[in-house]
C-alpha cells in the first residue's frame, strides 16, 4: 500500500547517530528482497555460487548487517509466517506479474536489450523457503536476534515496537504504520547510491523516519481512520482498492465522513464497489496474529566457524573477505552492546 503522498510532509532524513544504541525490528522478507534487487551483476542477474544457487541475499545480509552494526544499530530480523487467507488475491497477482516479466525477459535476451534485461531480471525475483532458512541460519551464526512471526512479518515488527522491544520497525512498505508501529524507518538496509530505473542516473539513498503520532496529527485523523484510507487506496488484502480513489481523495473522504460506511451511507462511495469485507480487513491491521518473543532479543558472540561453513564452503564466498567481515562483525557487536548499555543509562539521567 502506497502512502507516499500522505507522509511526504512528515518524513525526515534520519542520521545513524540518532539510531546508535537502539534496537530496530526489521521486516526480514522485505530486506532480503531489497538485497536480491540491489546486488546484481552487470547484466542484471543475481550473484550465484558455483552450483548456480542465488547468493545475493546472503551477501547483502552479511555485509549490510555488519555496516548497520558498525553504526551502533542493533538489528532484530523478523520473518513472515503463514499469510492470511485474505492475501491470496494479492499473492496470485504477484505470481502472474512474475510470469509476464519472465516472458518479457526472454524477449529482451533474444533482442539483446541490456537495460530491459536488468529491469525484468529484478521483476522475476523469488525468495524460496530454502533461501529464507539459510538466511536465518546465517543470522544465528552472526549472533543476530531473529523472530519468527506467526503471520505477517511487518505486523510482528510493529508489535515489537509497540512492546518497547525495538525503537522502530524498519521496512520499505508503509503497512507497519497501519499495524501500529510508533515509528517506521525506511531505507535502513539499502542506504547508499542506487541507480534510477531506466535512467543512467544515481541517487543517494539515506534512512528516513516517519513517526506515527506526528503523521496522524498532521493529517488530523486516527490510526483507525488511516486504516480506512488504506482500504480505499488498496492493501494486500484488497489490492484493487476502490476505483478512482487515490491517497488525497481517500483522505478527504475519511476526514469528511469519519469512516467508510458513513461515506457509503451518503453515496460518496458506491456499495457495488465494495467487493470485500471492510471489518475483516480492519481486523487484520488492528488485531493481527503476533507473538511476544520468549527469548531475549540480544546480540550474541558470532560463530566464525559456522559463518565460514555457510558462506565459504557452501556458497563459494571469498574466504579472505568473509574472515575480514567476521573481524568487523565481532568488533561491531561488542561496541553496539556498549552503545546499547549507554543508551539505557542515559534514560536515567
UniProtKB/Swiss-Prot annotation:
Residues 116-258 are annotated as: I-domain. Heterotrimeric PCNA stimulates the nuclease activity without altering cleavage specificity. The gene is fen. The lineage of its organism: Archaea, Thermoproteota, Thermoprotei, Sulfolobales, Sulfolobaceae. Its EC number is 3.1.-.-. Residues 1-98 are annotated as: N-domain. GO terms for molecular function: 5'-3' exonuclease activity; 5'-flap endonuclease activity; DNA binding; magnesium ion binding. GO terms for biological process: DNA repair; DNA replication, removal of RNA primer. SMART domains: HhH2, XPGI, XPGN. Disulfide bonds: none annotated. Interacts with PCNA via subunit PCNA1. Coiled coil: none annotated. Mg(2+) 1 binds at residues 27, 80, 152, 154. InterPro entries: 5-3_exonuclease_C_sf, Flap_endonuc, Flap_endonuc_arc, HhH2, PIN-like_dom_sf, XPG-I_dom, XPG/Rad2, XPG_CS. Mg(2+) 2 binds at residues 173, 175, 236. This is Flap endonuclease 1. Pfam families: XPG_I, XPG_N. Keywords: DNA damage, DNA repair, DNA replication, Endonuclease, Exonuclease, Hydrolase, Magnesium, Metal-binding, Nuclease. NCBIfam families: fen_arch. Binds 2 magnesium ions per subunit. They probably participate in the reaction catalyzed by the enzyme. May bind an additional third magnesium ion after substrate binding. Gene3D superfamilies: 5' to 3' exonuclease, C-terminal subdomain (1.10.150.20), 5'-nuclease (3.40.50.1010). PROSITE patterns: XPG_1. Structure-specific nuclease with 5'-flap endonuclease and 5'-3' exonuclease activities involved in DNA replication and repair. During DNA replication, cleaves the 5'-overhanging flap structure that is generated by displacement synthesis when DNA polymerase encounters the 5'-end of a downstream Okazaki fragment. Binds the unpaired 3'-DNA end and kinks the DNA to facilitate 5' cleavage specificity. Cleaves one nucleotide into the double-stranded DNA from the junction in flap DNA, leaving a nick for ligation. Also involved in the base excision repair (BER) pathway. Residues 341-349 are annotated as: Interaction with PCNA.
Amino acid at each position: 500500500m502506497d502512502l507516499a503522498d500522505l507522509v511526504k510532509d512528515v518524513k525526515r532524513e534520519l542520521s545513524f547517530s540518532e539510531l546508535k544504541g537502539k534496537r530496530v525490528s526489521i521486516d526480514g522478507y522485505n530486506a532480503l528482497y531489497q538485497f536480491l534487487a540491489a546486488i546484481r551483476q552487470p547484466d542484471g542477474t543475481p550473484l550465484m555460487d558455483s552450483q548456480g544457487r542465488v547468493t545475493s541475499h546472503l551477501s547483502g545480509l552479511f555485509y549490510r548487517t555488519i555496516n548497520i552494526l558498525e553504526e551502533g544499530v542493533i538489528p532484530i530480523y523478523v520473518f513472515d509466517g503463514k499469510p492470511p487467507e485474505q492475501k491470496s488475491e494479492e499473492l496470485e497477482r504477484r505470481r502472474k506479474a512474475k510470469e509476464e516479466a519472465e516472458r518479457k525477459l526472454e524477449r529482451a535476451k533474444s533482442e539483446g536489450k541490456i537495460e530491459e534485461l536488468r529491469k525484468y531480471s529484478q521483476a522475476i525475483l523469488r525468495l524460496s523457503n530454502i533461501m529464507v532458512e539459510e538466511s536465518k541460519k546465517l543470522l544465528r551464526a552472526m549472533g543476530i536476534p531473529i523472530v519468527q512471526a506467526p503471520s505477517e512479518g511487518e505486523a510482528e515488527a510493529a508489535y515489537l515496537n509497540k512492546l518497547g522491544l525495538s525503537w522502530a520497525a524498519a521496512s520499505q512498505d508503509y503497512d507497519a504504520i497501519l499495524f501500529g508501529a510508533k515509528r517506521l524507518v525506511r531505507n535502513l538496509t539499502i542506504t547508499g547510491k542506487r541507480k534510477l530505473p531506466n535512467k543512467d542516473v544515481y541517487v543517494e539513498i539515506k534512512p528516513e523516519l516517519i513517526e506515527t503520532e506526528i503523521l496522524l496529527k498532521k493529517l488530523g485523523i486516527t490510526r483507525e481512520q488511516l486504516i480506512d484510507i488504506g482500504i480505499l487506496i488498496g492493501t494486500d488484502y484488497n489490492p484493487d482498492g476502490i476505483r478512482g480513489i487515490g491517497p488525497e481523495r481517500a483522505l478527504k473522504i475519511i476526514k469528511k465522513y469519519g469512516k467508510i460506511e458513513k461515506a457509503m451511507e451518503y453515496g460518496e462511495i458506491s456499495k457495488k464497489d465494495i467487493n470485500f469485507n471492510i471489518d475483516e480487513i480492519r481486523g487484520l491491521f488492528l488485531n493481527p496474529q503476533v507473538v511476544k518473543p520468549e527469548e531475549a532479543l540480544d546480540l550474541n558472540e558470532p560463530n566464525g566457524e559456522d559463518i565460514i561453513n555457510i558462506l565459504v564452503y557452501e556458497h563459494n564466498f571469498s574466504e579472505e573477505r568473509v574472515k575480514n567481515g567476521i573481524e568487523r562483525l565481532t568488533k561491531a557487536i561488542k561496541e553496539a552492546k556498549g552503545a546499547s548499555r549507554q543508551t539505557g543509562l542515559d534514560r536515567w539521567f
